[in-house]
Amino acid sequence: MDIMTAIGCALKRAVPDIKKIYREKTEQGFVGHSFYVYPIMERATAEIGTYEMRRLSYCVVYFPDESKREINQQLDEMRARLLDNVTHLPEVHLRLLDREAEPVDGALNFTFSVRYRGLYEQEHNPMTSLTQKGGVANNGN
């Protein structure tokens, strides 16, 4: 299972009555009481050997149901629900770091990061021989 699918599972557990979870933008717009999930950035830091530390950041945008009144109340309730219930992704054994929820233009942006260390095999050509040309420089002595 990939991380995006695990995020969708965590959102579905936290908000079972959600109408839709999008992974792509739509030209028609998003229906109310739905999520749009997208990656923000990924960083890879090389470590000793062939290990890397990877940090991935994601944004989950919640669109409230506009047919109901009290949009701000819907955003407040969803902010509390996400911060209280979406803390880890058990399917991929990752904990969410730096969780933040902020209302922006009538929607709620829930951002977080995950971090993991991996062993990455890299193609390399082992040095089988070394040919040296040259010698010691003459210092004029």
Protein language model features and the residues they cover:
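Short acidic low-complexity segments
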Residues: 22-31
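A short, hydrophobic beta-strand-centered structural micro-motif
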Residues: 32-40
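Charged, amphipathic alpha-helical segments and their flanking helix caps
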Residues: 1-22, 41-141
